[in-house]
Amino acid sequence: MKKRIFAAFAACALLLSGCAGGQTAEDTAQDTDAANGELRELTVVLDWYPNALHAFLYQAEQAGYFAEEGLTVNIQSPAGVNDAMSMVAAGKADIGLYYQQDVIQARVEQDVPVKSIAAVVQAPLNIVLSLKEKDITEPADLVGKTIGYAGTELSEALIHSIMKESGQDPSSVEMIDVGFDLMSSMVTGNVDATIGCLVNHEVPQMEKEGFEVNYFFPDDFGVPQYYEGIFLANDDMIENEPEVLAGFLRGCQKGFEDFKNDTDAVLQVLLDNQDESNFPLDPDVEKQSCQTLLPLMETADAAFLSQSEACWQENIDWMYEEGLISTKPDISEVMATIDF
């Protein structure tokens, strides 16, 4: 998976410093286009390269669902790990697909002016993953073991939390920063397990390569349930153009309905839009990923794109307890309600 980091948001600061107040020439041009009945262009920056999680977006654009809302959506892969947040914060993009805990920390520690407008995945995808031969199925099995991770504070906090919740000493686990090499560090025996792999990506990929694996979810062991992906927008857009955001979300909803009803056809739309030169997709892996994602993107208790104050508060409380944030923000500082 893409390396997640809680960064010092220097990129945000640099971009924001270049933004003057008031309406830009681009804004004026867009207002004129809207008045003339032309489509309003939106730029959406993904969290990672195009994959099964994003299939509904490509379907919504291709099927004309965004056009029905007066929108044309330019879907971009990120050039840097923080682009989905930093570009949106600076007004260089309209909407980003990013991560719940990162938004909370960015708001608290750097006052980055973004909020979540919708939850794309209603449950975590992040797992503790190991080869089956290691016989690791719960936190207690990690005692005396090595865990590979991407050097992030979040991964450290997740392991600390699940070990503590299970009555184990967190220091009994050795955390090893393996950077991006999560899978290879496991299969070569450099570490016993990893945290940071995704159930919808690394699991089907490793299984296709012939590896038997075990995994468990941190939220089964004391970590609060959280949204693996959220759409975010900046404060100005939320205040001044909520109807544009609502139209975008309606288009996404229609794309997701197609994704549910004809998964193979929508997957083909994704494959037709893959970044083949940089990140070629394996159709078998992405098909299995779709089957994993669909019941997590919409559940019996939560509609697609819905988000709850309770989930945000539980994660704020947990992050504060784990020392990931210095103060607890109001929910209104990190989450916005867009009626669509």
Please tell me what each predicted stretch does.
Residues M1-R40, F340:
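Short, low-complexity disordered leader/linker segments with a strong preference
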Residues Q30-D177, S185-T188, D192-N200, F216:
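Short, glycine-/small- and polar/acidic-enriched structural segments
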Residues N74, N82, D220, D284-Q291, ...:
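Short linear loop/turn motifs
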Residues Q101-D102, D181-S184, N190-E276:
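Pocket-lining segment of extracytoplasmic ligand-binding domains
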Residues P170-E174, E276-S289, S326-E333:
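Short, surface-exposed acidic
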Residues E239-E322:
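Secondary-structure end/capping motifs
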Residues A310-F340:
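Conserved C-terminal helix/tail region of periplasmic/extracytoplasmic solute-binding proteins
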